[in-house]
Structure formats: C-alpha cells, structure tokens
Curated annotation (Swiss-Prot):
Note: Present with 2440 molecules/cell in log phase SD medium.
Biological source species: Saccharomyces cerevisiae (strain ATCC 204508 / S288c)
Protein name listed in UniProt: Protein ISD11
Similarity comment text for this entry: Belongs to the complex I LYR family.
Localisation per UniProt entry: Mitochondrion
Function: Required for mitochondrial iron-sulfur proteins biosynthesis.
Keyword set, alphabetical order: Mitochondrion
Length: 94
C-alpha cells in the first residue's frame, strides 16, 4: 500500500505521554497502576520495531486504545473509592 508513512518518533512519544496522562487520571489505584504498567510494557516491547507497515498498524491500534482509555478515565472520575493502604493519604505521587 504505497503512500503510507510510519509515525515519527515525536508522534509516538506524544501518544505515549497521552497514555501516561490518561492512566494517571484513574481514581482507583489498581486501575491506575495497571494501565501505567501496561502502557510502559507495550511501548517498550515495540520500541525497536522497524517495519513501517507494522509501525503504522501499531500506531493506529494505540490511537484507538487511547480513545477507550480516555473514556474510561472520565468514567472513573465520576466514582470515588476508598484509598488503599498502599496509597499515600495526601494526594498521589507520580
């Protein structure tokens, strides 16, 4: 499929930062830590990928996943949860 271009490093880093930002929006500690861990693991796993087709597919899939993560983080903010023992009492440290 001629005419497609792989995402730039800047685009990928921007997408990564959006994932981290949205994962940090979760009120629930377990969900927040899960999505932070999953984001880091997924991006590191594909960090050395060179094939432009694969990169483009990964980028498109990640953008779709980001949309889901954004919606879920908004929903998460509508509900409150009791703090867990592992969470600091005075706000969150990132």
């Amino acid at each position: 499929m001629p005419g497609f271009t792989a995402p730039t490093r800047r685009q990928v880093l921007s997408l990564y930062k959006e994932f981290i930002k949205n994962a940090n929006q979760f009120n629930n500690y377990n969900f927040r830590e899960y999505f932070l861990s999953k984001t880091r693991t997924t991006f590191r796993k594909n960090m050395n990928q060179q094939d432009p087709k694969v990169l483009m597919n990964l980028f498109k899939e990640a953008k779709n996943d980001l949309g889901v993560l954004k919606r879920q983080s908004v929903i998460s903010q509508m509900y409150t949860f009791d703090r867990l023992v592992v969470e600091p009492l005075q706000g969150r440290k990132h």
